[in-house]
């Protein structure tokens, strides 16, 4: 399969730079996987689409203020984007500079350059940086970091983004990008879903900056997926297995929840799914056999991205590309701060290729 098979024309005007004033008032395009039928509505229509006993699986990662600005002690300006916190003193990061720093280079970070750090080692495209500061890394990032808005949101981050670019149920700091399907859930909607009898479980996947990296090969089978840390605890496994036995659906909120659950299913030795704690490089594209997910809530993704490939593997290539064409025609808002889709599984998708 070719990467260009997953291309589509997207007018710049449809890229959302700010979220809707109310989280749950975004538009919702529903795609019936088996038939390809489309219906238009608003996000709160989920109340009618979900049944008592259905299980929603959320990603409770919390976005850290991962973008830092500063300079090398020798003078050159740098921009640091944290990929992962290694411990209380060290980070793994992308560094943008006119000349890449060498191990031992002193860095002065923050708007006032008050935070001192040292680049200690290089690991491929990533740099290991150690802070010379008594505070834990997370405290330093909260003090001097900027919210790492995606590259297609072409504006500086604002104070409001610290709340808006965060799900209301975020709990475990570590992501450098929000699990954006979850941004549409507010407390009243969550309460209404609980009242209806919809069950909820929480995995953790710390979204890395690699999620925004373009696919740089022509043939998708040649693509090497970036690695991200995921946790699927026993209580999530139990909730999934009980829902399946009851005949209810497992509904992933976002592609990161999909990748967490399917990673746990892939690694399982004896059951459908077992607890999973570790790095995952799972790459889902047409031909993949889904093991756990029955429905998916997700935003609209970039052309030629691994995420539109994941959706195509779930709903079928033709149904997915037709839905995207319709979304553009109907002027849905795209990407992280944009509108959402509700998609049911197409069992025939595994046999379909572009």
Curated annotation (Swiss-Prot):
Q: Name one GO molecular function term.
A: S-adenosylmethionine:tRNA ribosyltransferase-isomerase activity
SUPFAM superfamilies (UniProt xref): QueA-like (SSF111337)
Keyword tags: Cytoplasm, Queuosine biosynthesis, S-adenosyl-L-methionine, Transferase
Principal subcellular localization: cytoplasm
Q: Which reaction does it catalyse?
A: 7-aminomethyl-7-carbaguanosine(34) in tRNA + S-adenosyl-L-methionine = epoxyqueuosine(34) in tRNA + adenine + L-methionine + 2 H(+)
Q: Annotated pathway, please?
A: tRNA modification; tRNA-queuosine biosynthesis
Name any Gene Ontology BP term. queuosine biosynthetic process
Which GO terms of the cellular component aspect does the record hold?
A: cytoplasm
Any one Pfam family match given in the protein's UniProt record, by short name: Queuosine_synth
**Enzyme Commission identifier(s):** 2.4.99.17
- Entry coiled-coil feature ranges: none
Report which superkingdom the organism of origin falls in.
Bacteria
What NCBIfam families does this protein's entry cite? PRK00147.1 (NF001140), queA (TIGR00113)
**Assembly and binders:** Monomer.
* Biological role stated in the UniProt entry: Transfers and isomerizes the ribose moiety from AdoMet to the 7-aminomethyl group of 7-deazaguanine (preQ1-tRNA) to give epoxyqueuosine (oQ-tRNA).
Q: What PANTHER family does this protein's entry cite?
A: S-ADENOSYLMETHIONINE:TRNA RIBOSYLTRANSFERASE-ISOMERASE (PTHR30307:SF0)
Q: Which family does it belong to?
A: Belongs to the QueA family.
Please identify the protein, giving its name as recorded.
Answer: S-adenosylmethionine:tRNA ribosyltransferase-isomerase
Biological classification of the source:
Bacteria, Pseudomonadati, Pseudomonadota, Gammaproteobacteria, Enterobacterales
């Amino acid at each position: 399969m070719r990467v260009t098979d997953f291309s589509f024309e997207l007018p710049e005007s449809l890229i959302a730079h700010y979220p809707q004033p109310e989280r749950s008032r975004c538009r919702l395009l529903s795609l019936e996987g088996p038939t390809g039928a489309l219906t238009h509505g608003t996000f709160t229509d989920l109340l009618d689409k979900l049944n008592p006993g259905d299980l929603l699986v959320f990603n409770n990662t919390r976005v850290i203020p991962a973008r830092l600005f500063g300079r090398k002690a020798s003078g050159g300006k740098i921009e640091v984007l944290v990929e992962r916190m290694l411990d209380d003193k060290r980070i793994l990061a992308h560094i943008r500079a006119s000349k890449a720093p060498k191990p031992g280079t002193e860095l002065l970070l923050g708007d006032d350059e008050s935070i001192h750090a040292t680049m200690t080692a290089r690991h491929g495209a990533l740099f290991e940086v150690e802070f010379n500061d008594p505070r834990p890394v997370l405290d330093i990032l909260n003090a001097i970091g900027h919210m790492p808005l995606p590259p297609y949101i072409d504006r500086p981050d604002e104070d409001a983004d610290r709340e808006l670019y965060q799900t209301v149920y975020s709990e475990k700091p570590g992501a450098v990008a929000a699990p954006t399907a979850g941004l549409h859930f507010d407390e009243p909607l969550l309460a209404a879903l609980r009242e209806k009898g919809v069950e909820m479980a929480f995995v953790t996947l710390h979204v890395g900056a690699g999620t925004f990296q373009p696919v740089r090969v022509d043939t998708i089978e040649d693509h090497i997926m970036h690695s991200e840390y995921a946790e699927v605890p026993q209580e999530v496994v139990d909730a999934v297995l009980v829902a399946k036995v009851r005949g209810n659906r497992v509904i992933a909120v976002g592609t990161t929840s999909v990748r967490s659950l399917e990673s746990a299913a892939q690694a399982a030795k004896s059951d459908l799914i077992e607890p999973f704690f570790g790095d995952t490089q799972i790459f889902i594209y047409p031909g993949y056999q889904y093991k756990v997910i029955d429905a998916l809530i997700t935003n609209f993704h970039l052309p030629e991205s691994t995420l539109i490939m994941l959706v195509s593997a779930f709903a079928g290539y033709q149904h997915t590309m037709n839905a995207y064409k319709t979304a553009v025609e109907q002027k849905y808002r795209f990407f992280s701060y944009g509108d959402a889709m509700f998609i049911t599984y197409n069992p025939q998708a595994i046999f379909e290729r572009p």
